Amino acid sequence: MKTLVLAIVAVFTAICSFNSSPDLKAEFERKGDISGYAETVVYSEELPKFYADENGDFTVLQFTDTHFTTMMSLNDRFLLQKMKDQTIEYAPDLVVMTGDMIDDGNDGKFNKAYVLRTVAEMFEDLEQYWAFVPGNNDGVNYGASADVVAYLSQYEHCLVADEKNISGGCQYSIDIYDGSELTHSMLFIDTMGYDKEDPDYIYGYVLPDQVQWCENEINTKKAENENVYVSVFLHENTPDFFRAAKKGESYKWYYPQVTSQLEKYDIPKNQPLDDVFRASGSVGLLSMGHKHPATAECSFYEGIYYHVTPQTVLASTLITIHTDADNTKSMYDFESIYM
């Protein structure tokens, strides 16, 4: 009840602001268009180091596929308030949003800039660090994925960076240390939006220069610590998610495996990414959104966890990384946090 009341108050406050602000009205008329933002904003690629706790643990709270449209609706505000409540309750070391934070822009009251600003300001108020990777919807209209990343980069607690001269809206890594030693790293990869050049307008795929960046980044981490492991956060799946659905084993007996429904989402052109991850011997987790399952899904396949978080309107996932584990199977705990 408290969450609903707070959401109603937030909607009322937003409407009052709208009615009293000509600038906000004009922004809504433009649908919050941020096109070209990436060309006018220079943002730092320096990201803070993180540290595991005394037990070697690091926690990630993963949200995905919120599909916010306006922040003037009760649905949007209720979901945002639930995210805030969970962030406060579980106090993760890092929040990760794996794409489709914003809908495609076809809603009549859509305002891209207002949504981005509202989400970012919530995390600023909480002083909560969070990482973001784009999904296939974030860059469809009124600003590309690179514009979204540039807009969010203005906020101190939003950890986004874009490697120069690499395709996509962002590619970056965040390192976890145990004292002075690099003990784990997290990679964040833009799996690209819809491929508008394709006659069927299907999902895009990770391009060769992005794949090469991933390989180089993992090798850089291994040069610092040959025993380092890597977790990967992305929006869309690689073909090994489908193989994990067919041949993998369940994380826990009560935790659903990745389903073969992924076959209809299969993106064969993402195979080079799987090849790099498998050849490295250092990747322990791929965690995605996109698929909108009814519950979280997880399969362990050939040394790697393949995890799918449901839409945040249903649940988030609390991931505990045991950075001092000596094998990938015992390195992770997953917990569904229902809304």
Task: Outline where the language-model segments fall.
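Bacterial Sec-dependent signal peptides at the C-terminal "C-region" and cleavage site
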Residues: 8, 12-26
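N-terminal active-site segment of His-dependent metallophosphoesterases
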Residues: 22-113, 118
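Extended active-site neighborhood of metal-dependent phosphoesterases/phosphodiesterases
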Residues: 24-49, 114-225, 316-318
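Binuclear metal-dependent phosphoesterase catalytic core
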Residues: 24-41, 47-49, 173-179, 273-280, ...
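Active-site-proximal beta-strand elements of phosphoester/diester hydrolases
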Residues: 57-70, 183-193, 233, 305-311
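Active-site environment of divalent metal-dependent phosphoester hydrolases
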Residues: 69-72, 103-106, 132-144, 194-197, ...
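Metal-dependent catalytic neighborhoods of phosphoester/phosphodiester hydrolases
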Residues: 73-75, 99-121, 139-158, 244, ...
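His/acidic metal-ligating clusters that form di-metal
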Residues: 90-93, 185-188, 200-295
